[in-house]
């Protein structure tokens, strides 16, 4: 068994919560007197009895007790209320059946607020996790979650940032309409408990077993003790196994003891715990022949029940727990402790009246608490039952119905898959809803941004951004967009670069009159020390003239090469808009026009090609939008006008 763990939802409690246990507290709107609280208690008992009477609980039954002070783990404040706990163990049906009962109680008694939690904390929120407000989490849920009027209520953080229990209860009374959880949260929880109580009743399994007469006698008088017998068998240890080997209480005659056939009702969880565990019958146990398969199967299951009953009985007796149930004397002591008699003298008229009311309440509530008392102290009750006269003949001649079909035990995979698929659909719906919301938000932001910038969008920004992008220095990994950092631009001495190119091409870099006998002082500019060059105005002018002359020669040679190719037709040329150029062009012959190679407008072609690529994407992701996005540009929507 895992270690007990305290819930993060209730970190203020000093005691550690029991594992596999659900806790609940019911707070009336007004501070009731002890008599009024007792009356409310009885009304609730009468209300839930029709739901719980056909049900066999796994460990202990659903019950409520009166707390005139802070006697439960949910609060340190002295608020008169009803509280209870239910250990559900391996049977989660018990926990959700209890939740169903609490919702029904809150609907039938709307002037009460109910809290429910377990070792996982606010498990109702876990069930509706996909529908909760984002601010609600284990740290902010303390004193916020209640059941009231048949609905779940969550005290809003905007109203009470750090609520106390008293403040939250007051808020529920005064502004309950503001605290009601959303319809999606209500639906998630209501769907979880919509099949109850029928689902709880369907969870019962009836099976034929052969048990010793003494065990049959106990089960006939107290059917719910089967849960303690199964618990004793399932949680057995080496010490309790010693009691099963002897069977002193329920098999006093040993192998001479007769087995009788009875029908036992238990939960499906109990049945699974019995069937799935292999257990060798004690030597003293009278098992039938294996050849009779039906009788042997019935006796084998009955043997496990009988051994569990024996182990439970002996263990409880050893621990001295018999006789510790709630009695009248203990109940009276509690009344005196909490001031029920208001300091009245014993024997006075008013004292007798209060005493009569207390006795009447105890008698009425004892029928409901009787099951709880017996299960908390079963030894005494078992002794009382076995002290009555009984024999094997009491169980002979009775028609025992057939066992329920237990195919559900082996078909659980289908049910599990169904639950998983339901959860998967819920998760997919949540994710799709979230995705639609994010897309809508992005569209709205993009739309407002593009609409605002539509008229102010400058196509020149594309070429400028591309130039900046091309001049960035990238690493060995390739072209990268710098994030929160600026790369230094390439530093180059243009004059020296041009002189070096000039020297290599030989177009303008050498003196035509130089002779081969030169001493090399006027050789290649590659050998020149630019730090030694005299920095005078004549030198600068000479360098500028040489640079311009080289550029004209270089571009002229390049155009001459390109004019004979078809490359020119794939680009847009420079628009000749100046009138002087138009006049010059008109004076030229057609042959001269054909020989010309009109320069290409690189920026215009860049923008044109990017826009055509962007338009062909038809609003979908693509290379153009990705590249422009990396450069921080967002184009307006394509209007479809190609002009």
Curated annotation (Swiss-Prot):
Residues 528-543 have a biased composition (Acidic residues). Residues 581-592 have a biased composition (Basic and acidic residues). InterPro entries: Ecd. It comes from the Eukaryota. Residues 446-456, 564-580 have a biased composition (Polar residues). It holds the Pfam family SGT1. Residues 428-458, 501-600 are annotated as: Disordered. PANTHER family: PROTEIN ECDYSONELESS HOMOLOG, SGT1 PROTEIN HSGT1 SUPPRESSOR OF GCR2. Belongs to the ECD family. This is Protein ecdysoneless homolog.
């Amino acid at each position: 068994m895992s270690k007990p763990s305290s819930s993060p939802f209730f970190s203020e409690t000093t005691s550690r919560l029991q594992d596999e246990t659900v806790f609940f507290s019911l707070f009336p709107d007004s501070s009731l007197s002890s008599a009024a609280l007792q009356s409310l208690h009885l009304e609730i008992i009468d209300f839930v009895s029709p739901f719980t009477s056909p049900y066999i609980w796994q460990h202990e039954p659903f019950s409520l007790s009166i707390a005139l002070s802070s006697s439960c783990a949910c609060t340190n404040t002295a608020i008169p209320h009803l509280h209870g706990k239910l250990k559900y163990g391996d049977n989660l049906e018990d926990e959700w059946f209890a939740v169903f009962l609490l919702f029904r109680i809150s609907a039938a008694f709307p002037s009460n607020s109910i809290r429910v939690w377990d070792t996982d904390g606010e498990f109702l929120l876990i069930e509706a996790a996909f529908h909760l407000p984002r601010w609600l989490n284990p740290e902010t849920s303390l004193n916020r979650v209640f059941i009231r009027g048949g609905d779940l209520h969550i005290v809003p953080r905007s109203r009470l940032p750090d609520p106390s229990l008293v403040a939250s209860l007051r808020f529920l009374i005064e502004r309950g309409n503001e605290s009601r959880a959303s319809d999606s949260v209500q639906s998630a929880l209501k769907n979880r408990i919509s099949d109850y109580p029928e689902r709880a009743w369907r969870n019962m399994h009836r099976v034929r077993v052969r048990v010793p007469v003494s065990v049959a006698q106990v089960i006939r008088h107290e059917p719910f003790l089967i849960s303690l017998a199964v618990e004793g068998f399932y949680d057995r240890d080496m010490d309790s196994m010693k009691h099963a080997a002897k069977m002193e209480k329920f098999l006093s005659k040993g192998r001479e003891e007769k087995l009788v056939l009875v029908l036992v009702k238990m939960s499906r969880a109990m049945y699974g715990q019995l069937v799935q565990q292999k257990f060798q019958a004690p030597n003293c146990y009278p098992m039938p022949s294996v050849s009779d398969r039906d009788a042997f199967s019935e006796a084998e299951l009955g043997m496990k029940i009988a051994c569990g009953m024996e182990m439970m009985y002996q263990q409880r007796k050893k621990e001295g727990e018999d006789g510790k149930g709630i009695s009248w004397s203990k109940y009276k002591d509690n009344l005196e402790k909490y001031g029920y008699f208001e300091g009245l003298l014993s024997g006075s008229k008013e004292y007798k009246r209060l005493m009569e009311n207390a006795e009447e309440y105890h008698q009425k509530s004892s029928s409901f608490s009787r099951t709880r008392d017996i299960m908390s102290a079963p030894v005494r009750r078992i002794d009382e039952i076995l002290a009555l006269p009984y024999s094997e003949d009491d169980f002979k001649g009775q028609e025992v119905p057939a066992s329920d079909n237990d195919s559900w035990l082996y078909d659980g995979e289908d049910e599990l898959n169904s639950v998983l698929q339901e959860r998967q659909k819920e998760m997919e719906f949540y994710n799709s809803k979230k995705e639609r919301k994010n897309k809508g938000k992005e569209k709205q932001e993009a739309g407002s941004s593009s609409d605002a910038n539509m008229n102010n969008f400058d196509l020149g920004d594309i070429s400028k951004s591309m130039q900046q992008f091309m001049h960035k220095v990238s690493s060995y990994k390739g072209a990268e967009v710098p994030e929160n950092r600026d790369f230094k631009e390439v530093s180059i001495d243009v004059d020296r670069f041009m002189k070096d190119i000039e020297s290599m091409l030989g177009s303008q870099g050498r003196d035509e009159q130089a002779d081969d006998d030169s001493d090399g002082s006027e050789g290649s500019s590659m050998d020149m020390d630019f730090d030694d060059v005299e920095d005078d105005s004549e030198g600068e002018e000479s360098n500028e003239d040489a640079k311009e002359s080289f550029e004209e020669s270089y571009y002229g040679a390049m155009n001459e090469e390109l004019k004979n190719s078809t490359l020119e037709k794939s680009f847009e040329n420079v628009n000749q808009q100046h009138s002087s150029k138009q006049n010059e062009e008109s004076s030229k012959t057609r042959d001269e026009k054909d020989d010309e190679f009109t320069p290409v407008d690189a920026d215009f072609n860049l923008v044109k090609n990017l826009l055509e690529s962007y338009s062909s994407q038809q609003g979908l992701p693509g290379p153009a939008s990705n590249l422009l996005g990396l450069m921080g540009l967002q184009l307006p929507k394509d209007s479809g006008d190609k002009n």
